[in-house]
Amino acid sequence: MLALNINPVQQRAAERGSRTPEKVFKNVALAWHKSNRKWSQNTADRLLASLNNHIFPVIGNLPVSELKPRHFIDLQKGIEEKGLLEVASRTRQHLSNIIRHAVHQELIDTNPAANLGGVTTPPVRRHYPALPLERLPELLERIGAYHQGRELTRHAVLLMLHVFIRSSELRFARWSEIDFTNRVWTIPATREPIIGVHYSGRGAKMRMPHIVPLSEQSIAILKQIKDITGNNELIFPGDHNPYKPMCENTVNKALRVMGYDTKKDICGHGFRAMACSALMESGLWAKDAVERQMSHQERNTVRMAYIHKAEHLEARKAMMQWWSDYLEACRESYAPPYTIGKNKFIP
């Protein structure tokens, strides 16, 4: 630069003065956020809040061209020091995606946030307690004897056990999702949000419609519920306002009344683990069919596009009936899963 009679200090000052707002990290991040149209509104809002709370205060005003791995490492370490391990982990993903967006927009040539794995301690995987299957008779007895709250609450707990869907999938359910004729519950990818109720637009966890075949027992429970709430849009309306859903802690609160510690013994989400365990131990069902019914995330992105279709549906219909029959068989005394229903379900 000196050979060209250019003052390096003045040149750097001129370059700083010519920075366009579009190249500042915050604006690049907001453009990336705006470009993602597949997110639900809840996801978009939550992510934007995370950007505003944890990322923008640290590097928001820096040009993306000046960002180095050290900026991202220090940012993540700062979040980790606050004890926010899950936030730190998600921040790493967001940073990499945002800087990749900058590369795609030809603002920079490489992604300095691409290889940040291992910088922070991984978050501890959340453990949802579940009873051993040997305690099913006790659980069923306690559910049947539950009369301390609304009858609707007892039905909610029992139905959740039979269909083993996620809490929000149950709590925000509408009667329009139930097909009594074909005995199918189709949980949509998203739902019409309820004004004033956080996350009420949530549908199926994987953001694709999830098919839940309904056993004879599940249909019977739903008909009992329909006698109570059939005139409402929501299957499980709240106690005080029929236009809003039951409280998110309703099922777990009922389990605590039944005498269970929902942090150590069993929680509503733990029903999923119990069902999965029994289905696999039975030896009757292919692992892939069980995974489809559990609505677990598909790691193969090509196959993910087909999850919403009725994959393994016939097997899943039989599977859900087997699970309900298995619960009935365990009302009096425990029976190992592999001893129930082989002749009925296997040709």
Predicted regions and their residues:
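DNA breakage-rejoining catalytic core of tyrosine-based enzymes
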Residues: 19-23, 62-66, 108-110, 122-141, ...
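Basic/aromatic-enriched alpha-helical hairpins
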Residues: 6-10, 15-82, 98-101, 119-120, ...
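Short, basic (Lys/Arg/His-rich) helix/loop patches that form interaction surfaces
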Residues: 141-153, 212, 224-243, 249-292, ...
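Basic, Lys/Arg- and aromatic-enriched nucleic-acid-binding interface segment
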Residues: 81-94, 104-173, 181, 191, ...
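Catalytic-site neighborhood detector that most strongly recognizes the C-terminal catalytic loop/helix
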Residues: 122, 130, 187-194, 219, ...
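Conserved tyrosine-mediated DNA breakage-rejoining catalytic core shared by Y-recombinases
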Residues: 114-118, 129, 172-224, 298
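Short, charged hinge/linker segments at domain and secondary-structure junctions
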Residues: 2-12, 66-69, 100-123, 188, ...
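Short, polar N-cap/turn motifs at the start of nucleic acid-interacting alpha helices
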Residues: 110, 177-184, 265, 284-306, ...
